[in-house]
Amino acid sequence: MKKSTKRSVIAVAAAGALTIACVATAQAGQDSGSRASEASCSSSSVSATLLDIEYANGQLNSGIPNLTTTHATAADASYVVDSGADHAVAHKVTLGDPGYVSDGAPRSESATNDVHEGKFVVGDKQRYEFSVMLKDWETWESGESEAGDIIFQGKHAGGNLPSFYLMTKRNSIAFRSPTLSLQSTVVDDFRPHLGQWMHFRVDVSWTDDSTGYYKVSTKMPGESDYTLRQTYANVKTFHPVNPAEFGYLKWGLYRPDQTLAKGDVPTRVVYHDDIRVLDLSQG
């Protein structure tokens, strides 16, 4: 195994930007690179905040050169929008239009596959926070297609299924681990919060045995703090089928198994902001 590659970061306040030194050109593929030679993200002693992506500068990569932006080719598959005092990122997918197809499926997503601080390995204990707004969202009615829209993933590299993801399901938001066949509703009804920012937190202990955990919390509009919604303890959280040494985060809009022929909503748009990775190993 190669010696660990050292990365230099300047971490500022949790609400501030993150500057990454020793950067390299972002790779085209979202599973590119290997983290076998890299130290655990949790080994960082700079700050509890490993990564803070807030789009304050109005750029799709939030000023982080290695951040992967959408592979969909439509001009509006991803764009920056005003949000409060600064900005957020929008992802859009229109079914039946090849401009919104990425890696063979209807999706438009950003990812940390080439950002060291956005990767995870066995042994890491990390917190993932993000804010999401469902923009001009058509709600589900009884009898309509029940296919869900994936809005955030903790993804194993190597073309594997995600370890976990959050998805809209009918008019709710659910947490799911597909390989472990775990699923729970964490937002019972998002309809009162359409066009508003909803905040999510996922704590994960990354293990390749049955000692890990997922803890999912939400902070809805009008709430002052996070509420724990679901805990899965004593589970194997790092479980790629294909060989993979690391995982990474993805956010945006992925619409698996959806088609116009099935009556799925033609166009969806979702906003994301304040994507953060925090080290829990010292807590």
Regions found by a protein language model. Give the residues of each.
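Low-complexity, Ser/Thr/Pro/Gly-rich disordered linker/stalk regions
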Residues: 4, 29, 33-199, 204-283
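Secretory targeting and sorting signals
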Residues: 1-29
